[in-house]
Each structure stands twice: as structure tokens, then as C-alpha cells.
Amino acid sequence: MSDIEIAQRAKMLPIIDLAREKLGIPAASLDPYGHYKAKVALDYIDGLKDRPDGKLILVTAISPTPAGEGKTTTTVGLGDALNRIGKKTVMCLREPSLGPCFGVKGGAAGGGHAQVVPMEDINLHFTGDFHAVGVAHNLLSALIDNHINHGNALDIDPRRIQWKRVVDMNDRALRKIVVGMGGTANGYLREDGFDIVVASEVMAILCLATSMADLKERLGRIIVGYKSDGKTPVYARDLKAHGAMAALLKDAIKPNLVQTLENNLAIIHGGPFANIAHGCNTVTATQTALKLADYVVTEAGFGADLGAEKFIDIKCRMAGLNPAAVVLVATVRALKFHGGVKKEDLNQENLAALEAGFANLERHVHNIREHYGLPCVVSINHFSFDTEAEIAWLMKKCEALGVKAVLARHWAEGGKGAEALARTVADIVDHQPGRHTFVYGDEATLWNKIETIATKIYGAAGISADAKVKAQLEAWNADYGHYPVCMAKTQMSFSTDPNAKGAPSGHTVAIREVRLANGAGFVVAIAGDMMTMPGLPKVPAAEHIDVDDDGRISGLF
């Protein structure tokens, strides 16, 4: 059966009953969206602050491949397995974006027998959070152009506006546009463009805010552009935009509660990409889960060089979170791909390619242990085409590396197939928990922070940038030098070349552009050819998605 067929056969339980029975959340503290989705009230969350925190487990992966690694599937499977062995566990995930759903991925709610449900709702509109983020973002865009049209009292330089528009879709045609065409009645003629919603600073702010007051303050700090002197910033609060933006987000800030196929609880909230944003679910969701459960399993997007680095250096730094251990997801197929095998040949046994691709896993393990300071368990996500010889070789190689590796079959068997992984992780978390370290210190310059990530985590020889980028970073050091850096880089490689597989080293990371996300509280460094508005592939997943006369959706996976 396909993922969606498995999900549609799930026996879901009313979310209000599950929340009360498993986590003790009273019905009055939930805002239900139908029978199987609910938002958790902020006043209830505020009342949890004196409870002790549970233990936080981060799931990440080797560098992604077209073969798929199964990070979300592993997060769900591990959470289900921990509950099966008697550990009270909640999973924390990001909300899927419509762009990839209709583009390449076709969905992002786990897979096989390790999924969160209702799968179709989660993958499509869910509770409307992304819509709210997009509208709040575009309200600010409209207010900027409206202010300029009505006299421009703030002296905003139309050539130095930093705030693009957003839409939750992969649409390359919108990367660069012209607005205000058709005469003066339609506003000031200028260049503009669209980013995807998950790259919006409003999304990052929603994911890092700890309260409604913090949300509003961060929204007000957004720098939309500069005055005609080219130096003086114009803030969203100068346009009196932040109050209305916060009003649009008043429900979006509440975490969403759903269930797995095995009727365990998961919080799905926020959804920044890890290649063009910071790649983590909301701080509110994670902190809430830590107060409600003994164990919290969360994931960070793409490979450990992107999502996990940002989880540590941005999310943990800002929110004071302390992960106890990291699970690194790997597959035999993906490692063979990193070893040079074509996608169509990945189901054939190839120990030589497996050995060549192992360098990718080895570097990620090194980064997690040496640079993030955390114990690591390798979860080998089992595929039916994996041979016994390949599995045995990989297990032995991990043992030689000094890292525990566990074969997990949660895709096929659900939580039962990940019980060995759950016991291994729980043993480390209970008896040998780690204490994370940051890759760089707050006091380092912005240039040095970028360089440190590139050399330590990516294996680069150094970084490069033109004079304009260097001057901009230098100018920001005075007021924003303490900010962490959010790298925007291809997820497919340690380098900026998506075709450089394995563990390339000695390369140069070229920084093409830098952006100041003042409301979020970090600086974005865009490396290589990375785009903040993706495009659709030649054959988008949308071509295979349909709905029948009874409203039953097909084609999501």
C-alpha cells in the first residue's frame, strides 16, 4: 500500500480524548479543528512553566539524496517505539509546505507505518498557519508601497526596499517582478520579487517567538528597507504594521496537536526550510512538549550540516534548549548514491560504492560529536532491497567508528520495528546525556561565524565574497554582530555544488548575498546558487494528485 492508503485506513481517536488521557490537557484548553486536530491554548502553556523539562532528542540525517533518508518517518517511528517501551513521548515536527508537496516530495508527514495523521490535512492546508504567515508578510508589503504612494513621510528609498512578497508555492516566474505598472494610480514603479512562505522572516519569527508579546516585538523589529541616505533603517513598527501582523498570527502562534498511526501525540507547528531558513519547528511547540512528556523527539531539516547546525546555533542558543542526544538517519541506498551509484541502480548490491559513500556519514558523525558536543546514534532506515552483506558491512563500519548503529524497520512495522533503536537512544539519554556546544561564539564577527561554519562543518578551505557583501557584514557588526548566522546553501552536498557527493573538502564557499533578519535575530548568508523561491521539477508531484467524487484524495506520498 502507498503512504496515503495506509494513512486513510488509520483508526484515529478524537484528539480531545487523546490529549486528556495521554497528556492531561483539559478539553477547555484545546481549540479543535474538526475531530482530529486541535490547537493548544497559550494560557494553558503558560501554566506549565514550573514543570520540569523532559529529555530532548534530535533526529537529523546524512546529506539528502533523491533516494530519500526517512528523517520524519524515523522521528515518528522512534516516538512510537519509545511509547511502546513505556517512555512517555511526544513528537515535534514542522508543518509541510505546499511548494514541495506539489513539487518533488508529494507530502511530508512520515511514511509507511510511521506517519502522523490526518495525513491529507497536514500536507495541505492543515490549520491555516502558513496562510496566516503569508498574509501577515504580504500585509507589510502592501503597507510599504501604500506609504510610498501617499507621500513617503518616512523617506523610504524604493531602490533599497528589502522586503519581498511571499506565496506558499514553488514558482520560479515570481523570483523577479515589477510592481506599480499602469500609471501613478497603481503606485510607485519598482522591482520586487517573491520568496516562498517558508523563507519568510515572519515564519522565522513565529518559530522563535516565546509569547504574543515577543511575537509583536519581533515583528516590529523587521527592517523593511532604508531611507534615502542609504544607512538609516526603516522598521515595520515605523509603518505601524506590527500590531495588525500580530493580530493575523494570533491563532497561528498556538501549537497544533495531532496523532500518529499508533495514536501517540505529536505537535506540528511552524515550517521553515533548513536550506533557505533555520529549519526547525517552533520554540513554543518544543518547550510545550518538554513540559508535557518525559521524552521529546524532534527533527531538523535536511542533513546535520544544515538543520542540526541551525538547531544548535540558532534555536538552542535563543531558547536555551539542551538536547540530550542526536539520532543520525542513514540508508544503504543513500550512502551508495554518495558513493557514485545512479538512482536507478541503487537497488543492486554494491559494497564498493557503500564504502565510498560512507565518508558522508563519517563527517556528519564527527560534526555531531566534536562540534555539537552530543552523543550520536546511527539509525539505519531499512529498505527491502538492502542486502544482508550491505547491512553487516555498514554496522561493522559504524562500530569501528565508535558510534552505535541500529537497524530500524519502522516504515514496514511501525513503532515495533524501532524498539531496538528506542532502547539504545533511551539508554544514552538516561545514562550518558550530552551537553551541546556551539560551533561559534556570540563574540565572533559575522564573517568569522560564516567562515567557522564553512571550515568546521562543511570541510571547506574558506569562504569568499565580493566587496559589497564584505562591507555589508562589516557594517552590521556594530549593532548585529552578536547575531547567529543562518546559512542558505544547497542541502545536497557539504559544498555549494549539489553534485559534489560524499564528503568534499578543500572547497571555497562563495557567499553571494547577505540579508539581515532583525526580527528573527539572525543574519542570512546565501551561498552559491541557492534560491529563496524554488521552482517546480519537469514532472511535478501535482500531476499525480487527485480527489474523487467522495472527496478522497490520492497521489500524496
From Swiss-Prot:
- What pathway annotation does it carry? One-carbon metabolism; tetrahydrofolate interconversion
Where in the sequence is the signal peptide annotated? none
EC class (word): ligase
**SUPFAM superfamilies hit by this protein:** P-loop containing nucleoside triphosphate hydrolases (SSF52540)
**Is Ligase a UniProt keyword of this protein?**
yes
Q: Which reaction does it catalyse?
A: (6S)-5,6,7,8-tetrahydrofolate + formate + ATP = (6R)-10-formyltetrahydrofolate + ADP + phosphate
EC numbers on record: 6.3.4.3
Looking up Pfam families in the UniProt record yields: FTHFS
- In which family does this protein belong, per the annotation? Belongs to the formate--tetrahydrofolate ligase family.
What's the protein name?
Formate--tetrahydrofolate ligase
